[in-house]
Structures are given as structure tokens and as C-alpha cells.
Curated annotation (Swiss-Prot):
It comes from the Bacteria. This is 5'-nucleotidase SurE. SUPFAM superfamilies: SurE-like. Transmembrane segments: none annotated. The gene is surE.
Length: 249
């Protein structure tokens, strides 16, 4: 089996190196990742310039683009032999609840949705790699066990691992996405020439983090695993929308 590994923290990120090391003796692993940090890139594609893959000394391939660019190239022609599945991460920082809408880590996994096997997005609840071995352990465990899964086509599994030593993890919980409150207002700054600029501020506080959510699971010391799908159609809105449209005719 061949696994395409990518991330949004960049090709030299410790989480990517740890993920590759965890899977290297399980499958033929190919790493294609952004040449710099692309956190928050979501599913964006680069359309205003060419992409230039560059093979590094360790065999990893860096690309001057987004995580989605990297997986797109890997699946659609850059590799002589197409991968069987996509595994993204290990992100240093959580991707919980609404975070998945912005996450380049999750987006890389979503780009692998056309392959025959589920894609995985792994995130670690710390910006520091102290307990990264815990995340690598669960990445290997879940990827190796995927062959026993019977999931709908194009399913992506979003996995978040607490920042704990392995022996302190309480288990794995199947979860739904929680929700955050509205994000903080952008931070206004003024440069030396008097021009105003803005920094995107922190994500909103957890608003829906009760039992059953990914937020709740990781706080309780569990690895959370949330199945995601591409179809964002709001079926619950069909009835009221049909009534509304009837009134417009």
C-alpha cells in the first residue's frame, strides 16, 4: 500500500517527521508538503502562479503551495504510482469543532476523498512536541486498523490527540464536531508609515463542548475521532425553503 502524507505546518515540521516515522515501516510513504507554514489555508488551490515541487535530501517533496495543492499534485500526476490513501498531520495544535473549516490539515485529507480508502487528519493539542510520540502512536494504530473499516465513500476521519503521555490517555471516543462562539475582533496595528493593518485574532471560545463533542473528549483525556463528509447540504432546511420558494412563484 502507498500512503501520501501531507500537512499544513510545512515540510520541516516535527509533526510531519513523526508521522512519517510512525508509518514508514507499514506502507510505502511519500511526503508532499508545503515549503512553509500554511496553517489556515483551508482547501485553497494556487491558481495565480505555477507550482514547483522540490525533492529534499530526506526524500520529502516540498511545494510552493497549499496543503491542497500538494495532495492534488500527488494524486493527479506528480507521482508515477498513485497513492492508496492520504494521511495529513501531525498538526501542532488542535483542529476541533469549527476549526475544520479553516484547517489546512483537514483540507489535505479532504483532497484525498476520491481514493478508495478513508483519509485521516491528525492533530495534537499542543504547539510544543513534548508528547508528540503519543500522537504518532495513535496515528499508526488507526491507520493500520483502517482495513477493518466499512465507511461511506469519501469519508475523512478527523483525529485529535490530547497533550498527554501515552499511559495517561483514557481511550478513543467517537465524537461529533462541537462549536465555537464568534471569534475575537481583528487586532488593529499601525506600521511606521502610519498605515493601518490587521491581525486575525484568536478563535472564539467553546460554545458547544458538551458530552459527545470532540472538545469534551480531549478535555477528558480521550483521543477524539470525528467522521467528516464533503456534502454540506442542509437537509433540515428543505421544507421551509420549499415553502418560501412556492411563495415566490
Amino acid at each position: 500500500m502507498r500512503i501520501l502524507i501531507s500537512n499544513d505546518d510545512g515540510v520541516n515540521a516535527p509533526g510531519l517527521v513523526a508521522l512519517h516515522a510512525a508509518l514508514a515501516d507499514y506502507a510505502d510513504c511519500v511526503v508532499i508538503a508545503p515549503d512553509q507554514d500554511k496553517s489556515g489555508a483551508s482547501s485553497s488551490l494556487t491558481l495565480d502562479r505555477p507550482l514547483h515541487p522540490h525533492t529534499l535530501e530526506n526524500g520529502f517533496i516540498s511545494v510552493n503551495g497549499t496543503p491542497t495543492d500538494c495532495v492534488h499534485l500527488g494524486i493527479h500526476g506528480l507521482l508515477e504510482r498513485q497513492p492508496d490513501m492520504v494521511v495529513s498531520g501531525i498538526n501542532l495544535g488542535a483542529n476541533l469543532g469549527d476549526d475544520v473549516l479553516y484547517s489546512g490539515t483537514v483540507a489535505a485529507a479532504l483532497e484525498g476523498r476520491f481514493l478508495q480508502r478513508p483519509s485521516f487528519a491528525f492533530s495534537f493539542l499542543s504547539r510544543q512536541p513534548d508528547n508528540l510520540a503519543t500522537a504518532a502512536h495513535y496515528a499508526r494504530l488507526l491507520v493500520e486498523a483502517h482495513e477493518q473499516l466499512d465507511l461511506p465513500p469519501r469519508t475523512v476521519l478527523n483525529v485529535n490527540i490530547p497533550n498527554l503521555p501515552l499511559e495517561h490517555i483514557r481511550g478513543i471516543q467517537l465524537t461529533r464536531l462541537g462549536h465555537r462562539a464568534r471569534a475575537a475582533a481583528p487586532i488593529r496595528v499601525v506600521d511606521p508609515r502610519g498605515r493601518a493593518g490587521y491581525w486575525i485574532a484568536a478563535a472564539g471560545d467553546v460554545e458547544d463542548g458538551g458530552a459527545g463533542t470532540d472538545f469534551h473528549a480531549v478535555v477528558q483525556g480521550y483521543v477524539s475521532i470525528t467522521p467528516l463528509q464533503l456534502d454540506r447540504t442542509c437537509q433540515d432546511g428543505f421544507s421551509s425553503l420549499n415553502t418560501w420558494l412556492e411563495g415566490l412563484r
